[in-house]
Amino acid sequence: MGVWAATQVMGKLQETDTALVIKNSIAINGTPYPIDDTYGIPTAIYHGTLEGLTGPSLHKFLRRMCFNGEAFKEFLNITPRRPLEELKEELAEIERMYLSLPAASFYWQQAVVGNNDRIIPPDNQLNAWRKEAEISRKTLRVHYTEDAHYQVELFRYYLQEIWTKD
């Protein structure tokens, strides 16, 4: 949901501060359409996750975010522990906001799509970025990786090697 949230925030910032210059924007394993059968997480899967959220199902979801068992263990060491009710409320609120807010007009220059993403189907991500390129009529570079939805090496690369380089 981070790409959608960033799209909303950055779109608002650009509306209010016309002098704001974004040199580079990279969406990683997400889309501006968080709940969508073609461009995001399929609606039935999202609702199934929300309605069936339990301790064991959350554990399974978090495991699916990671590439393998070792990556999952590392992820568990850094992820915050939150009450299930709080997570359910957040998921319900994300859907409410997604359905009620106008589409943001933020333009992503690059997108990273992990072929091993088991949260947002890679084909849906590709569909979303094709749609965004058509809407904006701008070039959008899509990078294909073999990464999972969350992969520490991927984020480390983009945060340390790319983002801090300039």
Locate predicted features.
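Gly/Ala-rich beta-loop-alpha elbow adjacent to hydrolase catalytic centers
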Residues: M1-A6
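Flexible "cap/lid" loop of the alpha/beta hydrolase fold
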Residues: G11-G52, E90-E93
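Short, flexible active-site-adjacent loop segments at beta-strand->alpha-helix junctions, enriched
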Residues: T31-P34, F67, N115
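Conserved alpha/beta-hydrolase catalytic His-Asp/Glu region
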Residues: T38, G52-E95
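The feature captures the conserved acid-bearing segment of alpha/beta-hydrolase catalytic domains
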Residues: E95-S105
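Short alpha-helix in the alpha/beta-hydrolase fold that links the catalytic acid
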Residues: Y107-Q109, P121-K131
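Short beta-strand/loop motif that positions the catalytic acidic residue
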Residues: A111-V113, D117
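Catalytic active-site module of serine/aspartate enzymes centered on a nucleophile-bearing elbow/loop
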Residues: E134-D166
